[in-house]
């Protein structure tokens, strides 16, 4: 098993999620292959992997790093496969979960109603379908870091303005905006942000089976604790979502509605997902055990 890491060499003390995951992966028995942290050009891939030997048999690998463009992911995947090293998520599988509009048709009623638009002119019809207020995000990422007003529209005009801002930010949208039903999630206010936090949890899964999970938001309160029955119900929704997708390694964010039911907020590729409150040691030990089967 191999971890393809963009963490610095040697690993810094402390560090970000990439460093923490790399450290945990090595401790769990993964061999480390390094890629530059600032991998910007396709021409850099082959030189970066030049000293990596061809394996006698196909060896599974997990990439831990910064969000790559589609072309970069394909280039790294091809260079590794030439050495008989196979990323757990091939390029098509990576895109299925990383660009939410690809996953949405398979998730169906597990998640909020969603309409995908690629122009501002399509927004009014999308809003008519999902209703107001509506939540808008890019195909990749939202603007939650900029606050509630950067994501939630109460009028068609506001929705059009949010869509225009997302379409300008290709690193968030890749040219597509998701206009989503604003679900009645359980929400709590925190002093540090005007974006209300919910009872939302991130789950990492391999082949539909949970590896590890943790509270999503970077704030802790009594609302974050899960009872055994709640955890089982939440994980069941995450597992069902993962089983509907062809992608092997998946992150599923699950939130609780005001009526107590659980829904999928979004999905992603754990190779480039934040850990939230997931213990990296637990995650990578479980992943090592599953890949060794």
Question: Which residues make up each language-model segment?
Answer:
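A structural preference for short, hydrophobic beta-strand core positions in alpha/beta folds
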Residues: 32-35, 89, 116, 254
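Catalytic phosphate/metal-binding cores of nucleic-acid and nucleotide-processing enzymes, i.e., regions
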Residues: 114, 131, 143, 173-174, ...
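C-terminal active-site "lid" helix and adjoining low-complexity regulatory extension at the edge
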Residues: 244-247, 256-293
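Active-site nucleotide/adenylate-binding loops and adjacent lid/helix of ATP-dependent enzymes
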Residues: 1-11, 15, 52-56, 76-192, ...
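Short beta->alpha transition motifs characteristic of CBS
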Residues: 209, 213-218, 267-274
């Amino acid at each position: 098993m191999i971890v393809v890491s963009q963490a610095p060499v040697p690993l810094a003390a402390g560090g970000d999620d990439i460093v923490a995951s790399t450290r945990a992966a090595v401790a769990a028995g993964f061999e480390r292959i390094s890629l530059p942290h600032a991998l910007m050009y396709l021409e850099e891939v082959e030189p970066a992997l030049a000293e990596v030997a061809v394996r006698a048999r196909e060896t599974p690998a997990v990439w831990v790093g910064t969000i790559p463009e589609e072309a970069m992911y394909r280039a790294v995947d091809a260079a590794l496969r030439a050495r008989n090293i196979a990323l757990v998520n091939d390029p098509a599988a990576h895109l299925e979960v990383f660009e939410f509009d690809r996953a949405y048709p398979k998730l169906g009623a597990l998640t909020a109603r969603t309409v995908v638009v690629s122009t501002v002119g399509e927004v009014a019809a999308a809003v008519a379908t999902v209703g107001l207020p509506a939540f808008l995000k890019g195909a990749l990422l939202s603007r939650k870091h900029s606050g509630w007003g950067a994501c939630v529209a109460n009028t068609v005009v506001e929705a059009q303005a949010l869509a225009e801002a997302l379409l300008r930010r290709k690193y968030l949208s890749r040219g597509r905006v998701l206009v989503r039903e604003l679900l009645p999630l359980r929400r709590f206010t925190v002093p540090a942000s005007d974006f209300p936090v919910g009872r939302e949890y991130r789950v990492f899964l391999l082949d539909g089976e949970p590896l590890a999970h943790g509270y999503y938001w970077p704030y802790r309160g009594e609302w974050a604790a899960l009872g055994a029955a709640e955890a089982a119900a939440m994980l069941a929704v995450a597992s069902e979502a993962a089983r509907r997708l062809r992608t092997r390694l998946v992150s599923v964010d699950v939130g609780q509605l005001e009526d107590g039911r659980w829904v999928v907020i979004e999905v992603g590729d754990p190779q480039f997902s934040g850990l939230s409150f997931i213990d990296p040691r637990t995650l990578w030990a479980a992943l090592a055990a599953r890949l060794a089967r």
